[in-house]
């Protein structure tokens, strides 16, 4: 995404860089300052004590209960349909550019991006609320030197794309 952003300057690329680095810091950073190798694929759900992808999947009734604004557009944007369910649940992923969402809602791209951010905030809050019935997967505490070295390279690329975000300092801290 860093190289793509340097070539094309699409906001989606910059957002993806920022969100990915934030996720790494929040979920994968170890007390040592290095980054963990992996998360367990399985986590408990209300239906199963060990379900692959359980923390990251949503039932349609859970999504409906969130009372998200523009729910039909939400379902379209994240490809929630009877054909996209995985074992009866949904893995939310963007299937359309923000421009298409703006056109669908008949609003400008900034307002569409605001809608997307609101949906993400509601989903994050709902994830926090269901943490007892669907806890986060366990993090493997192992830190691999080679993978942390790749992260240094990735952070350096992110710094070239977005030099004011401090990614260079993060990369140097791993050296």
Regions found by a protein language model. Give the residues of each.
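Aromatic (Trp/Tyr) and acidic
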Residues: 1-174
